[in-house]
Every structure is written in C-alpha cells, then in structure tokens.
Amino acid sequence: MRSVIKNINDMANLYPNREAYIGINEKVTYKELNEKISKMLIFLSKIENNIDQICTICQKESNAVAILLATSLLNIDNSIIPYDAHQYTKIEDVEFTNDVIVISEEDFDKNTTILTDVSNHFINSPIEKNNIKDIVEKESLKDIQLFFEKSCSPAKLILYTSGTTGKSKGVIVSYNQFNFINVPITEQNEGINIITKGSSVRPFLGTILSTLKEGKTILQIDVDNCFDMTNLCERADIESLTTNIYGIKKFISIAKKNKHLYNRIPLVTITGGVMHQFLREKSVEVFPNAKLLDLYGQTELGLISVIDSTEWCENEYCVGTPSFFVDVTIKDLHSHMELKEREIGHITVKSNHKFKGYSNHTAIALDEVYTGDLGYLKDSKLYLFGRISDCLKYGDSWLLKRDIECKLSEGFSEKFQVLVRDGRFYIILERHSSRIEKIIEDKFSSFKQLIQIKIVQEINETN
C-alpha cells in the first residue's frame, strides 16, 4: 500500500474518532475507515492487478473506499475521492452526472427501465422513464446512443445519454466501470472507451492532471461520436481516454503505465461548481497531506467553472464541449519556462477544433481558448488570475482583489469598491466604517500596509 493508505492509518492512530467524508453521504471515523481498508486488503493481496475485481469487492463495503484503494494500489499519492451520488453500484433512481449506464444482457431481458432526458434542450429538458429494450429495438430516442461492448463476458450494453449535467437521472443496473480502461479503439469494439455525447463543460474544465514539469501535457479527451474518435486516434498519441467522472479512469490508466511518474504530482482542478468545491474541501479532510491545486479564472467565452445547465440563461455564452482535444500546459507563454513555486506566469488551453456552446451557440475555438496569469499562494493552491493587476504579493503570500471583495461582502452591507493601483489595494467607501477596519484587521492583517481606505462622495467607474 502507498502513502494514501499510510496517511489514513496514521490518522487512525492519532485521531481515531475524527470523522472523514469519503463521499457526500458517507462519513466515517478514521478508525472505522482504517478497519474497512484492513479488511479489504486481505482480499486484495492476490488480485491487485485486476482493477475491476478490486472495485467489485470493495464496493460491497464502501463506494468511496473502493476508489481510494484502486488509486492507492497504483501508487497515486494525490488521489481525490469522487462523491458517491451515482457511481459504481447497483443504485435505483439516483441522479447521475457521468451520463453512462452499463446494462447487462440479464437486465435487457428483464425489460429494465431507466430515467433519462429525451430532448436536445440543455435547459429544463424533460425526464422520462424508458424501457431499455425499446430503446435498442425501436431506436425511439434519437438523443441516446447505445454501444455494444463485444469483449465482455457476459456482454454488456453501454448507454450514453445526451447528459444534462446535474439534472439527468438513471438507474445504474450493473457495475462495470473499470473494464473500459486502456482498450484500443477499433471498429470492432467502438463501444469501449467512448466518451459521453453532448455532456457539459465538465470534461473540459473538470479534473485535469498535470506534471507541472517541463511543460508536459496530458490529453483530456471528449468526443461526440465514433467518427471523431477514429480520426483523433489516427492523429494523436492518446495517453488515455476518460469519462467525465473526475478523472478516476485517467488516474488509473496513466499510472499503470508509469507508476513512478505520479508520485509527486499535484491534482489540478478547474473548479466552480458547488459539488466540486465540496469535493475539494472534503478531500482535504480525507487526505490531509494531499496537495490539491485549484485553478480559477474567467474567459471571454464564459466563466472557467463547472456550472449546471439549469443555471444558464438563454443569452449566456458558454464554452461547451470540445470535439477533439485540449492540451494543458503550465508554463509561462512569454518565456516558455515552466512555473516554479510562487512564480507568476501564463497558462493556456488550446484546441484545434470547434467548441459547441449551449443555447445553439457555436464558435471556432481561439488559438488560446483561455489565458490568465497563474500563481502559487502560500496554501499550495494554484490560482488562475484574470489579470496580474488583480493580485498583489507581500513576502511569500499573494492576495487577490476578489478575496477582499468576498470578505467585505460577507460582513459589510453598504456600497464599496476595491481597486488595485500602484502596488496597493484601495477600498473605496462613501463614508467611514469601523466595520471595514475590523474586517481588514481580522482577515488581512499581514497585508494591512498594502490596503488603504479612501472616502469619496460617490462610488463610480471613474474612481
């Protein structure tokens, strides 16, 4: 076992009654978690190379622990546990956001039904119950793709829905998640490793791994159909194909190729959705020693974040899903040097194909789909800044303009404005407030000398 399990073992000895979130609805003490792991390891000692068998055994105890063990067995130190709202188990009528349902022949014969969205509308699309057999035989739902995986025994159908993320519901009637890893894509087995059709921005802006070394890139792939995938595989050296379930399959497939490469790799996430924020925070509790880096930013095309489709407006222009690939480089665009800790540089994501936006918007991807100034903070989190002028450095620490704005908004109800000028933050008020001074003292004491309060007659854009 590697360091993730060792960390939990250490925590069990130090804080046996401390509770750890291993899923949104799954909370145990470190002592209980350690006991679960110890129990499972007895079964895993002889089968550690069979990921599917590992997870099948582990899921009987705990979905999240199953993932923890699967990643730990493969020597991935910076694992992150996905929330268990939908994955890996025989759960009926649950929300799912990975838009994949695996159906066995037995389920097919029993006329199993599923709940899925049936329209091409990404906003407020209807949810209906449909019989799987009818879908296969009549092809009555054109918005649903079915692929037959011929290499499995017994054979299984893999159902990919159009995927209104955060809204679709389905029945996961059979566990088969890790069978699709690192299988070559051919015309004969086109159902294997096919990525969900029309899913949300999550595959593009969701979990991304990066070595942060020598500008190495890792492909995050999301395609619409087998034709695109065939072209992609002919044109690029694909390290792995993954669904949009927080990169778990990417963790495993890449780590299997080079176990030593990912010993020191931070997990980079571009987050914004509530669930991702929850996941990030709770993963720190579960893995206190894990190094999690978070990217935040904004682009001309829309927010760099994961936003449920129900939150979008008709006139909102979102990036959508890349049809081919995006590569992520963590290095300065000007010097072309990799970023060191506490350095500021540029990050870019590039694509060679179209990006499909929601509400029928389409656009050719820019050479630089988004760019932003990048920097490390003292808490080991990586931030993507909209502009370099929006943050200031003092000593080894960085302070963002929006950090001040957020804290002031929480504790101050009157109108204010935060500006960055000449190496200082200026808080603009229309009248003096002792409350502002207290917030600065409590929240930004180490930056006090960089923060000044200015009183004006009226707050406006010309301040």
Where do the language-model regions lie?
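AMP-binding/adenylate-forming catalytic core of the ANL superfamily
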Residues: T56, S351, D367, G372-N463
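Conserved pre-ATP/AMP-binding loop-to-beta segment of ANL
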Residues: P16-E19, N120, S125-N130, D134-Y160, ...
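Conserved ATP/PPi-binding loop(s) of AMP-dependent carboxylate-activating enzymes
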Residues: T321-F325, S335-D367, K381, R387, ...
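Conserved AMP-binding/adenylation subdomain of ANL enzymes
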Residues: N179-N193, S200-S240
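Conserved AMP-binding A3 loop
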Residues: T29-Y30, F147-E149, K156-V183
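Conserved AMP-binding/adenylate-forming
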Residues: F43-A85, I195-G198, W398, I453
